[in-house]
C-alpha cells in the first residue's frame, strides 16, 4: 500500500523574499509538489527543486480560478499519491488565508498535515513603513479585519470598534472597499480626522506609504493610484513614522544583478547601508566543457602562472580538477594570480594561497601590475575566465611578448523567468549594479523585447570592470554609468555613495 504523503500549510511571509521563515524555506526546497497562491515574491518558487511540480491555485480578477473545494481535493489527491506537498500562501496561512478550511478537509480525509506559521502582512507591512500597530499611550490593542466584502457590512458592524480610540485597525484586502471603510467608521462614531495610512506592496522594493485621514482616505488613494496588494491602517499610530534616516543610503532602491553568489555578496554589503534591495540573480553559469578539456589537454608542466578573474573560475577549475587524471602534485610548481581579495579567499579555500593580487581589483590592473612587477621574467601564463571578458589582458601580454593562453572556461546566460521578475520591478530603482557585460545585455535586451519600461531616466548603473561600463554606456549613456574602482562589493557600495547626492 502506497504511503500517504504529508501536506504542509506554509506561510510565505508578506512579500520580501528574505522574510520567509527558515522552516518554510527548508520545506520549499524539499517539496515534491508546491501548490501556491498569488505571491508578492514569486522569487521564492525558484528555491524549489528542478523536478518539483508547481501548481498555481491563486485567484486573478476576471479569470476562471479553482474553487476552494477543488483546491482541497487537489491537496488530498497529491498527498495520497505519496507526495510531499507544500501549500504556499502569502503571509500566514491562518490569517484570512483559508488555511483552516484546508486543514479541516485534510483532517476529514485522514491526510497528515502540518501548519508552518508565516509573517503576516497585517503587522509587517505597516511596520516596514514605520507604523507600529501598538504604541504606549496611543494604542493598547490592534484589530485585524478582512475588508473583502466590506460593502455588505452594516454601520452596526463598524460601530463595535469605531469608538475605541486606543485601538489600531488594520484592514487587509481593502483597496476596493476604501469608501465603505471610511463612511462606515465615520458613521459609527470615529472622528473624521483620525490618522490613516495605506501601505502598498509592503516589505517589497515597490513598497510605498500614502498618509491620509479617515475623511480624505478615498481621495488620497485616487490621487496616488493605489492598487493591490495593500494594507489600510486606521488609528493614532498611523501618524507615526519610525523609519530611520540615519543610514547612508536610507530610502535608496538598489537592484543587484549577476549570479547568485555575486548578488548575495553585494546584497549583504548594501543591506548595511539601509538601502532597499531588489535581488536579480538571473545570471546562470554555463561551463564551456570544450575549453575546460583544452586546459587539461595542455597539462601543467609548462604552465608557470594561472590567472583567475573570478571566484566562479576558481571553483569551476578545481571542480573539474577533482574529476581529472591529475592530482594536486601536478600544480606544485604553478603560481596563481587573482583579480582581487574575494577571488583570493576562494582560492585559499581550495588549498592554495594567491601569489599575486593587484592593488586595484580589476582585470586591467591584474595584467598591468603583474607585468610591472615581474616584467619579461614571467612566462607561460594561462588565464581561466568567462567568455566575453575584456581583451585588455591579452593586449598587455602580447605587447610584452609574454607567452599567454586565454581559456574562456564558462559563460553566463540569463534565466528568463528570473530576469522577467527583476525587470518588472526595475522601474522603481535608483541604482542598478552590473558585474558583467552579459548581465547588461540580458537586462536591456529583455526590456526592449517585452516593451517593459525598465529603468527610470534618473536611475544610474554602477559597473564592475571597464568592459561592463562600456557595454552599459552604449545603452543609457556614460553620464548615467559609474565605474566601481575595484571588483568588490564594498567598492560597488562606495560608488553608489559617491553618486547618491
Regions of interest found by a model, annotated:
Residues 90-165, 210, 356-361:
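Class I SAM-dependent methyltransferase SAM-binding "motif I" and its flanking Rossmann-like core
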Residues 1-17, 22-119, 305-313, 332:
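Class I S-adenosyl-L-methionine
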Residues 14-15, 52, 61, 67-80, ...:
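Signature of uroporphyrinogen-III synthase
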Residues 37-50, 116-135, 335-345:
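Short, compositionally biased "basic patch" segments
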Residues 107-110, 133-135, 187-193, 324-331, ...:
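A short alpha->loop->secondary-structure connector
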Residues 7-8, 85, 142, 169, ...:
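Conserved hydrophobic helix-helix packing surfaces used for dimerization/oligomerization
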Residues 152-197:
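Conserved anion/nucleotide-ligand pocket segment
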Amino acid at each position: 500500500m502506497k504511503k500517504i504523503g504529508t501536506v504542509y500549510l506554509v506561510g510565505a511571509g508578506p512579500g520580501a523574499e528574505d522574510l520567509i521563515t527558515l522552516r518554510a524555506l527548508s520545506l520549499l526546497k524539499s517539496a515534491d509538489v508546491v501548490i501556491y497562491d498569488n505571491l508578492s515574491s514569486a522569487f521564492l518558487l525558484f528555491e524549489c527543486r528542478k523536478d518539483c511540480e508547481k501548481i498555481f491555485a491563486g485567484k486573478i480578477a476576471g479569470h476562471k480560478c479553482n474553487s476552494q473545494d477543488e483546491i482541497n481535493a487537489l491537496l488530498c489527491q497529491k498527498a495520497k499519491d505519496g507526495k510531499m506537498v507544500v501549500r504556499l500562501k502569502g503571509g500566514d496561512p491562518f490569517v484570512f488565508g483559508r488555511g483552516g478550511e484546508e486543514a479541516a478537509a485534510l483532517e476529514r480525509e485522514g491526510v497528515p498535515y502540518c501548519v508552518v506559521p508565516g509573517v503576516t502582512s497585517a503587522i509587517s507591512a505597516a511596520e516596514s513603513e514605520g507604523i507600529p500597530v501598538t504604541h504606549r499611550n496611543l494604542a493598547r490593542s490592534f484589530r485585524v479585519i478582512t475588508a473583502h466584502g466590506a460593502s455588505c457590512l452594516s454601520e452596526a458592524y463598524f460601530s463595535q470598534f469605531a469608538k475605541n480610540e486606543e485601538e489600531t485597525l488594520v484592514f487587509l484586502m481593502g483597496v476596493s472597499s476604501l469608501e465603505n471603510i471610511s463612511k462606515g467608521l465615520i458613521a459609527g462614531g470615529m472622528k473624521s480626522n483620525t490618522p490613516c495610512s495605506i501601505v502598498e506592496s509592503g516589505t517589497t522594493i515597490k513598497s510605498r506609504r500614502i498618509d491620509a485621514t479617515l475623511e480624505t482616505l478615498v481621495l488620497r488613494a485616487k490621487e496616488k493610484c493605489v492598487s493591490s496588494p495593500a494594507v489600510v491602517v486606521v488609528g493614532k499610530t498611523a501618524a507615526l513614522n519610525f523609519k530611520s534616516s540615519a543610514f547612508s543610503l536610507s530610502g535608496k532602491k538598489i537592484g543587484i544583478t549577476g549570479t547568485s553568489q555575486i548578488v548575495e555578496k553585494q546584497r549583504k554589503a548594501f543591506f548595511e547601508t539601509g538601502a532597499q534591495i531588489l535581488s536579480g540573480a538571473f545570471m546562470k553559469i554555463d561551463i564551456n566543457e570544450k575549453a575546460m578539456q583544452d586546459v587539461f589537454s595542455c597539462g601543467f608542466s609548462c604552465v608557470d602562472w594561472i590567472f583567475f578573474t573570478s571566484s566562479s573560475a576558481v571553483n569551476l577549475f578545481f571542480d573539474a580538477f577533482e574529476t581529472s587524471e591529475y592530482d594536486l602534485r601536478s600544480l606544485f610548481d604553478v603560481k596563481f594570480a587573482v583579480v582581487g581579495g574575494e577571488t583570493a579567499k576562494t582560492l585559499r579555500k581550495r588549498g592554495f594561497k594567491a601569489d599575486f593580487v593587484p592593488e586595484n581589483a580589476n582585470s586591467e590592473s591584474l595584467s598591468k601590475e603583474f607585468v610591472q612587477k615581474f616584467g619579461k621574467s614571467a612566462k607561460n601564463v594561462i588565464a581561466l575566465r568567462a567568455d566575453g571578458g575584456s581583451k585588455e589582458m591579452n593586449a598587455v601580454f602580447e605587447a610584452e611578448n609574454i607567452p599567454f593562453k586565454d581559456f574562456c572556461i564558462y559563460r553566463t546566460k540569463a534565466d528568463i523567468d528570473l530576469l522577467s521578475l527583476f525587470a518588472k520591478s526595475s522601474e522603481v530603482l535608483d541604482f542598478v549594479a552590473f558585474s558583467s557585460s552579459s548581465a547588461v545585455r540580458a537586462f536591456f535586451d529583455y526590456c526592449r523585447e517585452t516593451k517593459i519600461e525598465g529603468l527610470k531616466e534618473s536611475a544610474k548603473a554602477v559597473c564592475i570592470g571597464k568592459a561592463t561600463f562600456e557595454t552599459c554606456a552604449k545603452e543609457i549613456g556614460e553620464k548615467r554609468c559609474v565605474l566601481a574602482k575595484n571588483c568588490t562589493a564594498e567598492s560597488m557600495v562606495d560608488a553608489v555613495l559617491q553618486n547618491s547626492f
